Amino acid sequence: MNSSAVHTPVDPKQAHILVVEDNVSNFVLIARLLAFMGVQKCEWKTTGWGVVDFANTMSRVDLILMDLRLPHEDGYDALRQIRIDPRLQNTLVVVVTAHGSTTEMKKAREAGFDGFLTKPLDADQFPEQIRQILSGEPVWELGI
């Protein structure tokens, strides 16, 4: 999110979330956890390539959960495209990665991501992490 932008809190039950994840099992877990929270809309894209065009087909996007290691265009490349798109530039974009390290987290923060979650996701903590993110509170966690 643009550092000068103010995030308007979003109720998870009204949220429109785009998950950019190439692993079907990971997407299914995320989608089920979001559905359990009552998230209104969850869309899935398997690569960073074309993520802006895809997101612009959605009526709105409140949050993008982005894997870093993706085919064709990684999460960092996709984020750069998102940040220059007038409609999406202030959208919250949070890393969800299996490559959790302090170095990767620092790189993600410097690149302009709005948060960092590591896989495997903790099914007990994930709903609260998403609530925090949607309310405008950053979540930067390496997990276990």
Where are these regions (language model features)?
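Acidic, metal-coordinating helix/loop segments flanking the phosphotransfer/catalytic sites
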Residues: W44-L63
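Conserved acidic carboxylate
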Residues: E21
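The feature encodes the CheY-like receiver
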Residues: P71, Q89, S101
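A Lys-centered signature of the CheY-like receiver
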Residues: K119
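Non-catalytic signal-transmission and effector/linker regions of two-component phosphorelay proteins
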Residues: M1-L18, A31, D124-I144
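Two-component/phosphorelay signaling modules centered on CheY-like receiver
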Residues: V24-E43
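Active-site residues of response regulator receiver
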Residues: D67, T97
